[in-house]
């Protein structure tokens, strides 16, 4: 289900993904904070589905203007234990440690947290780290 929020005019395009890091200081007193940052969860990745055809709103953070958009949490690729890699299953995510910085996005992907409940959508490959082979799974977070 889509979430309604506000994003800067320059980002307001279908398909654009962003990470919400939490509200900035000026947001705390803004009258639009409820719809803008109130519907988003800090640390999560969002993808813009649709830009609503409504007037833009003033914002001191986004070069003056924000637009109303519909967003969803997209699927994210993550390295998981091979024994857990069953398409369609729901697992509790255990993010593995990997010292290889080039593989960080697979082992600690932004938008997912250790302990998240996720559904495995697809297995897209394999990755090695510390002499161990992991499956690369495309997952969707299951909300409580």
Swiss-Prot record:
InterPro entries: UPF0179 (IPR005369)
Top-level taxon in the UniProt lineage: Archaea
HAMAP family found in the cross-reference section: UPF0179
Record-stated family: Belongs to the UPF0179 family.
Protein name: UPF0179 protein TK0790
Protein species of origin: Thermococcus kodakarensis (strain ATCC BAA-918 / JCM 12380 / KOD1) (Pyrococcus kodakaraensis (strain KOD1))
Upper lineage: Archaea, Methanobacteriati, Methanobacteriota, Thermococci, Thermococcales
